[in-house]
Amino acid sequence: SVWVFYRNMRPLYVLLHWLDSYQTGKKNEALNNDTQITEFRKLNDAAVRYAERTEQMFEQQKQFIGNASHEIQTPLAICRNRLEMLMDDDSLSENQLGELMKTHQTLEYITKLNKSLLLLTKIDNGQFTDTKDLELNTLLKQCLEDYKEVYDYRNIEVNITEQDRFHIVMNESLAVALLTNLLKNAFVHNMDGGRIQIIITKNSITFRNSGSGHPLDEEHIFERFYQGSKKEGSTGLGLAIADSICRLQHLNIRYYFEQEEHCFEILK
């Protein structure tokens, strides 16, 4: 009968459900799937072994990226300092100085990229455990002060509408990284004489900015290294960092295009 068939196949359905809900690098429930059928027991054992190998590979990959990024920091800093010393040499010709400046810009880009990769690794590893109650309204205004000069340089107008206070318990460094990456994004993908509107409610923060008259690819914009249109100095990791922080904090982040403006919304 159908009931007998379902009863016999139940261990398979339990295993499939466990595999479907399994997330590498996360805290997963142990497979609890007792069965007298030898083939299903072997299948259970094989699935658990495969999951364990996947976890080991995932941990090794995270450690490699983290260690590599950390070790690269010192030689990058040394190279940058030596280049700056060379650029102070009065005997350099204009062409030589120009080439050194180009090299310095490339080195600055690599340094930014390395720092972003290191931050992503720390987020993935769950290393930001020190949390406290934060009010992001005040923190956002503090972050904006750091960008006032560059916004003024491009005549970008910034307005904040505070409908309520946005409170959250999280690591302060991560909160700053989340807000600054969205502020950077609104600047980099804006235009001279453009505008940025930030709307804060009790459960959401929305960044709206003028820019190109075309919507971004919402399926890929949060992927690491994705750049719909290459912007000078952009690593392609800013939105990926924002997305990783939101997922860690159980926040939702979404993009939409409305009234010729690019909108990024953080939702509790």
Report residues per predicted region.
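Membrane-proximal HAMP signal-relay module
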Residues: 1-68, 72, 77-88, 92-94, ...
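Alpha-helix C-capping/helix-to-loop hinge sites
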Residues: 2, 50, 124, 185, ...
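DHp/HisKA dimerization helices and adjoining segments of the cytosolic kinase module
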Residues: 77-192, 197-198, 214, 220-248
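Short hydrophobic beta-strand elements within the C-terminal catalytic ATPase subdomain
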Residues: 198, 253-257
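Short beta-strand-loop-beta element adjacent to the nucleotide/active-site pocket used for signaling
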Residues: 200-206
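Glycine-rich acidic phosphate-binding loop
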Residues: 208-215
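Glycine-rich GHKL/ HATPase_c ATP-binding element in histidine kinases
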Residues: 260-265
